[in-house]
Amino acid sequence: MTSESPTNYDGIDSRIDTVADRVGSVWPLHSFVTANPLSGFEGSPFEDAVAEGERLFGGRGYPRADIFRRAWEDGRIDDDALRTELERRGIERDPETLLEAMETAETKRDDDPDDATAAVDRVLSKWLAAYLDQGQAPWPMPNREEGFYSAWRAVAPYDSDVPGCDDTEDVPATATGAVETVLDAYPRRRWDSIIEHHLAALPGWTGFIKQRADDEFDPWQSEYPITLTEYLGVRLTLVDLLDAPVAPETDADAGDETTAVREAWLSAWEQSYREHLLEDVDDDVTESSHGNGKRPAAQLVFCIDTRSEIIRRHIEQQGPYETHGYAGFFGVPMRHEAYGSDVTTEACPPIVEPEHIIADRPDAHHAEQETAHNRWHGLVSAARKHFKRLKTNPVAAFPFVEGAGSAYGSAMALRTLLPSAVYKLGSTVDEHVPSSHEFCSPTLDRPRMTHEEKVEYAQTAFELMGWTEFARLVVFTGHTSHTTNNPFDSSLQCGACAGNPGGPNARVLAKICNDEAVKDDLRERGVDIPDDTVFVGAEHNTTTDEITLFDGEVPKSHHADVAALRDSLEQARAGAAAERSEALNGADPDKGVSETASRAADWAQTRPEWGLAGNASFVIGPRELTADSDLDGRAFLHSYDWTTDPDGDALELIMLGPLVVTQWINNQYYFATVDNRVYGSGSKVTQNPVGNIGVVQGNGGDLMMGLPLQSLMSDDDSPYHQPLRLTAVIHASVENVTDILREHGHVRRLVDNGWVGNLTVVDPTRDNAAFDYVGGLEWEPSVQQDASSERVAAPAASD
């Protein structure tokens, strides 16, 4: 490859971007977003999309036969449901024969690329890791400010893995020229398939480049830009130099003949789960009261995250407390700038554009706490920088190891053998060193948040949750996670905050709602907040179930309320930690608090918590819908009251936002479980972090796209997460839900195409009768309805 293409195709960049829509975005590990890896195919039926995923990425789309077998033998797949789903597809063989057929089909899988293509992948991955490094490498790749293609072109002659490139003149001068040089040897009708083939060859790196190029706030992209055209330019140049195949094979695989069988088993499993869920929902709708007229001691608003379901139950058991569910970014589209940082992080879902930069700024009357905080953290930071310089300095490294080896060895032994002691030591230090939230408050005017916007954010929150009454204390509770030596720690943070802690958002909404001018305007709009209601921000540590109250500005009149709540939260923590310990391998439920604290500090712990593993449903409705039910931490819960939303406007926002996000989360867990090698990231044991952006398996290769094996499996062969598509249950009229689906085609496609596995409406206008969505805006009575009661005809879709 020595010359530019003679044919200039001006639209090549846009053509590449269009084809790249089929590759899902991949976010950096420090801001991990649990997204659907097949999001580019959501416009297609699920079964077609997974077939495309297998063709492009080599990923399995359905659970293995042994997973189905275990679920069936454990009673999680109902025999009647399985029989119904098989008959619906005209499959007449018995379940055992079908399981054996699936097992046989699985042994035929062969995904190894040819040697030349493997060499291209290896060399390209090496240079992508070097170029995209975000501060991990002590010696960075030169010329990165010129762009990826130019930087690679400058070093390619010195790479012994790249034959036939002795001088920069041996390759085209531009990425576009490199792409066109290769493509011009093929008819234009084949260009898209060739582009698609090479973008899909390393979907992790491609997805990361795609995400980074789209992020206008990314400082690394601003400093060291990279585009998909540059990626393809380098790849196709390597393909040419290494004599690898350019075009994909034309003899497409016929696919898995057992696909219909797998779809039947999966649907039966999902139907069985839905029936079990509706038993709890139906009982609670008919038997629970909607309040007793007494004002609660406090109202706590949690993220809809499945981990909130457990702690909410235990808080409600402690006294007259109400808990509610709301999107964990609390409706504030923002980026957050932490104290002492000059970098902002996204704190809203990827589908929402940030509109504000909220900075933590110190208060003048807390100068003493700020000084103490800065003194301690300054010493720690200086020590870390000093040790890092010693370890990376070619001259000082060996004497440093000789002199400090015993001290490091002792520290390693302590962290390995006594993680609980390390956690207690850290907690003791934290108690004596002020945290930034003790002397900082969120600044709402960078760029300025208008008064109207503040009122809108507060009003939207209360309208979506259907609030008409307020306690003396209202606590907005974001969530975070605490783990040690865990590259995937951000996957345990708040998904609604783009893989970051939700505490800053909770503090912002609390500050907004405490604004007297905001309260006055809310009252004029019908949101009657009592004069004695105080709003507080808080943060739930999902690893230890500890809840931190940001109560520094609470007036003295409410100190007793806060003290009582804090005691109740400690009791709830003990109960929740004990319950969650039952699912943690080797943990003692009788020592739940110490067990969870130990796991948080244990740097050898591969499963500090289960995160959202087990998620299976999204329930939209009042707390009474699921009160007193143990949903086993498997349900996203969003508060909603149909009586305050006659036109369905609030429900529309919930279905457009949280429903879409929970579907993303659910499908990330689903696909990473059914094929962890392709859609997950494999075992943590063999992972290596690369460039502070992600992990690779072994010493190189593609950037892994999803969750690690240990986040999903109890062991290598036994999944903890049950791979089911999302079941959505909505407490509203069928007419309102139907109108929303009709109005918003992208939401309807998620349901019609099977990305949301089941949608059931519990209709309060029809005595809480349940109706299942069957596609095409049509409904039928749920099979779960009591056969002895009078059946309610499925309502026709409104015109």
Swiss-Prot record:
Described purpose of this protein according to its UniProt entry: Part of an energy-coupled inorganic carbon pump.
Membrane topology category: Peripheral membrane protein
Alphabetical keyword list: Cell membrane, Membrane, Metal-binding, Transport, Zinc
Family, per entry: Belongs to the inorganic carbon transporter (TC 9.A.2) DabA family.
Compartments it resides in: Cell membrane
Subunit composition and interactions: Forms a complex with DabB.
Molecular function via GO: zinc ion binding
Protein's name according to its UniProt entry: Probable inorganic carbon transporter subunit DabA
Binding site for Zn(2+): C303, D305, H479, C494
Cofactor(s) this protein cannot do without: Zn(2+)
GO CC annotation, single: plasma membrane
Lineage: Archaea, Methanobacteriati, Methanobacteriota, Stenosarchaea group, Halobacteria
Region Disordered, annotated ranges: 574-598
